[in-house]
Amino acid sequence: MACKSSRSLLLLATVMVSVFAAAAAAAAATDCSPGVAFPTNLLGHCRDYVLQQTCAVFTPGSKLPEWMTSAELNYPGQPYLAKLYCCQELAEIPQQCRCEALRYFMALPVPSQPVDPSTGNVGQSGLMDLPGCPREMQRDFVRLLVAPGQCNLATIHNVRYCPAVEQPLWI
């Protein structure tokens, strides 16, 4: 009798350890912290696209090709490259972390590092306060980046929007 209860206890302990190990692995796989699931200097192309769409301007040190920031921008089809590059950046972020990456992107400080003259890259991404184009207007557009009318990317729970994007989970 004692042998049977020992086996049952051992079996129960094994099952519990397996369940806890699976839960820990799942939690580690969905860790959407900045620097873990996505880089902390992310979405430079999305910053350019957001400014292009909301403010009709390009950022100094834009990561877009020079021909896109010139007067030739009015040719049909060229503005879509900014969207394409942004959507590619978002697609590289794990599906369950895209909303958190957008939250982080909206909260980043204004780029303060100088432009690298060889690459044209600004030190960080983030939204910029520009005359006539406040950050809140840009945030409204950032919320739409994963939506069907923009990048059409699935996020957490397989939906194409970010619920409560104003509330960062990493604070």
UniProtKB/Swiss-Prot annotation:
UniProt-listed SUPFAM superfamilies: Bifunctional inhibitor/lipid-transfer protein/seed storage 2S albumin
MF terms in GO: alpha-amylase inhibitor activity; serine-type endopeptidase inhibitor activity
Tissue/organ expression: Endosperm.
Record PROSITE patterns: CEREAL_TRYP_AMYL_INH
CDD domains xrefs: AAI_SS
Subcellular location: Secreted
One Pfam family recorded for the sequence: Tryp_alpha_amyl
Keywords: Alpha-amylase inhibitor, Disulfide bond, Protease inhibitor, Secreted, Serine protease inhibitor, Signal
Gene Ontology cellular component terms for the protein in this record: extracellular region
Gene3D superfamilies: Plant lipid-transfer and hydrophobic proteins
Leader sequence segment: 1-24
Primary localisation category: secreted
Cited InterPro entries: Allergen/soft/tryp_amyl_inhib, Allergen/tryp_amyl_inhib_CS, Bifun_inhib/LTP/seed_sf, Bifunc_inhib/LTP/seed_store
Quaternary data: Heterotetramer of one CMa, one CMb and two CMd chains.
Function: Part of a complex with inhibitory activity, but CMd is inactive as a separate subunit.
PANTHER family xrefs: ALPHA-AMYLASE_TRYPSIN INHIBITOR CM3 (PTHR34481:SF5), TRYPSIN/FACTOR XIIA INHIBITOR-RELATED (PTHR34481)
Similarity remark: Belongs to the protease inhibitor I6 (cereal trypsin/alpha-amylase inhibitor) family.
Protein name in the entry: Alpha-amylase/trypsin inhibitor CMd
Native species: Hordeum vulgare (Barley)
